[in-house]
Amino acid sequence: MKPVVVILGRPNVGKSTLFNRLTRTQNALVDDMPGVTRDRLYGDVEWNGVFFSLVDTGGFLSGDDDFFMPHIQSQIHRAIDEADAVLLVFDGKSGISPFDREAMAFLQSASCPVFYLVNKIDSPEREVYTAEFFGLGLDNLYPVSGAHGYGVTDFLDDLVNALPETEPEPPADDMIKLAVVGRPNVGKSTLINRILGQERMIVSDVPGTTRESVDTVCEIDGRSYLLIDTAGLRRKSRVSVKLEKFSAIKTLKSLDRCDIALILVDAEEGVTDQDVTIAGYAFERGCGCIFLVNKWDLAKEQEKKAKTFYDDLQDQAKFLSFAPAVTISAATGFRVKKIFELIDAVHAQYTFNIKTGELNNIFERATRSKEPPFHKGRRLKFNYAVQVATGPPTFICFVNFPSGVHFSYKRYLINAIRRETGLDKTPIRLFFREKPGRIDFAALKPSEKRGGKKTRRK
């Protein structure tokens, strides 16, 4: 699980510019497949071989006064408690404001490292504007420029050294790890409580791997499932959409750890942009996904609405066209047992492994049926393919011009794999390399490393 770093600062200090600067250090975030909603609330960053998730709080505070409201501070406290480091950004041009002083005092109780960034300092000559900030006696103070990159490398060197080492997820005895995610008040807590209250279930709480989190093991029909970080979900609370954005940190951490994301959407309200954004989080992290259309007992004209709802999901979340959907009612228990039948089916595909010979036969038939296109006057030649991971199934194909493979032909090859293997309910990762040879797992991008288990060539 990657460390999480949170950016704080008053409006217009350049948080978003700095955010974009840092996240561009790893430009190809995941797949180039069209249709993935990219909410710039978070991004993945790599520096000197260290990966971490960066969360931008820019959309949380509309003005300085928001910060001082008790319920806002409570939510910021929660975000900081979940973070492994905090960046407080100042405006080097306008100097210290009352907001900055209050924010510094607020962060004195933070248990994680705090880095103070004086932004808009783009040259050594402009560092004179940082004098009043250095006069505050702050440790970890850095003059930087999000727009031009000045000072960013020095700051990043110290930041990654302060982050906790990423520890591998402990073995879960072959339990399927589940994360229940969704927008506010969609029924996450109700579903968790319904699952844990079902008959014939054996329930126990076990320590999670994140601070103050609790994972819950439940056994259904002899199979064990791990519900990730149920502590927050089982405490029912109604908060505004604005405040709920802080929970994105917890959502990201849960998605980093899970095999399958159970994405709840509201049958009454329909598919919203926020639903698609959360689905995008899960897709980018390579999770198996199941849409749970909740509150179906309250929906009017159910049969007619079901087809419309599924069509909307397919239209707005094209990148998750493989994800099954089922209508449920967490409140009444309607079809809740059906969820676990789908989980088992998705997980079987999520951990699918294919022999190298069979995989290459699929590629041979696909490229023979639809000839590869040209790239700069030369036809693409697909030499060899190998599965390098499961969870999700991840493949690398060696081709003479990797950058010349258009997303449409890549999609065609993925569909060929789906068609011939029956993998219609799992994400599939396909990457291209120029030269065949030994797979260097250390050099893979984060999106390529999402697979839970490496596979040997057969």
Swiss-Prot record:
GTP 1 binds at residues 9-16, 56-60, 119-122. One of its GO terms (biological process) is ribosome biogenesis. GO terms for molecular function: GTP binding; ribosome binding. It comes from the Bacteria. PROSITE patterns: G_ENGA. Pfam families: KH_dom-like, MMR_HSR1. Residues 352-436 form the KH-like domain. GTP 2 binds at residues 182-189, 229-233, 294-297. Belongs to the TRAFAC class TrmE-Era-EngA-EngB-Septin-like GTPase superfamily. EngA (Der) GTPase family. GTPase that plays an essential role in the late steps of ribosome biogenesis. This is GTPase Der. The lineage of its organism: Bacteria, Pseudomonadati, Thermodesulfobacteriota, Desulfobacteria, Desulfobacterales.
